[in-house]
Structure formats: C-alpha cells, structure tokens
C-alpha cells in the first residue's frame, strides 16, 4: 500500500530548506537607511506662539547639534537632526530654551517616543 509518490525524492524538501536561507540573505543584503530623528515642538498651551526656526537653529547650533532641516507645520515645528545620537542633548537644550513647549523626539522608522518634557 505504499504510494509511489512517497518513495520518489521530491524537489519540495530542498526548496523548503533553501527558502529561509534565501530570505535571510536578502534581508541582510538590502540597503538600510539610517535612522532619522525628528523633534516635534508644540506650544504647551493652545494660542501660544512658537519662536521662529532661526532661533531654534541658533540654540542647537551653538551647542554643536547638527540639523538637517527645520519646518513649521500646523502650529508646531519639526526639527530633523543629522545624527540620531544627538536627540537627547537636543531635546534637553530645547526644553531649557523653550520652557513653554512640549518637545517630543521621534524616530522615522516605526515612530517611537523617546522623551517628553
């Protein structure tokens, strides 16, 4: 009662073994974009104004924080940093320089709230 299909070697078994290996190799070789950190600055209370981007640039630049861009957006300011490692220092600097604001640090790949003041 043995089926002839069970005795013959099938091509499926090697393919099932090679597929995970191929998937692993492709995921490791794909180019990865570096993580980018954004600081999202909003007023603490509705109706309060935010400083202009140049003021924010001056505060961060004088402390050596490299900035990619500063963009106003819907009563908030988005600051993109050149180095994700500087996000903690930048958040601390802005929390002191802008006491009436909320500063949230976010990573662009899977938004993660890093810190909040």
Curated annotation (Swiss-Prot):
UniProt-annotated location(s): Cell inner membrane
Spans through the membrane: 10-29
Gene3D superfamilies, per the entry: 3.30.70.260
Record-level GO cellular component terms: plasma membrane
Residue intervals annotated with topology Cytoplasmic: 1-9
Principal location listed in the UniProt entry: membrane
UniProt entry keywords in alphabetical sequence: Cell inner membrane, Cell membrane, Membrane, Transmembrane, Transmembrane helix
Membrane topology: Single-pass membrane protein
GO molecular function: protein kinase binding
Segments in the Periplasmic topological domain: 30-117
NCBIfam families per record: PRK10629.1
Function: Modulates the activity of the EnvZ/OmpR two-component regulatory system, probably by directly modulating EnvZ enzymatic activity and increasing stability of phosphorylated OmpR.
Subunit structure comment from the entry: Interacts with EnvZ.
Family: Belongs to the MzrA family.
Protein name: Modulator protein MzrA
Lineage, broadest ranks: Bacteria, Pseudomonadati, Pseudomonadota, Gammaproteobacteria, Enterobacterales
């Amino acid at each position: 009662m043995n089926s002839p299909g069970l005795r013959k070697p099938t091509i499926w078994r090697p393919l099932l073994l090679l597929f995970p290996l191929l998937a692993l190799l492709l995921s490791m070789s794909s180019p990865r974009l570096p993580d980018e950190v954004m600081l999202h600055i909003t007023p603490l209370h509705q109706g309060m104004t935010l400083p202009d981007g140049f003021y924010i640039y001056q505060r961060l630049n004088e402390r050596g924080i490299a900035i990619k861009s500063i963009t106003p957006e819907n009563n908030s300011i988005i600051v993109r940093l050149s180095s994700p490692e500087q996000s903690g220092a930048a958040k601390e600097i802005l929390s002191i320089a802008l006491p009436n604001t909320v500063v949230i640090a976010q990573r662009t790949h899977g938004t993660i709230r890093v810190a909040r003041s």
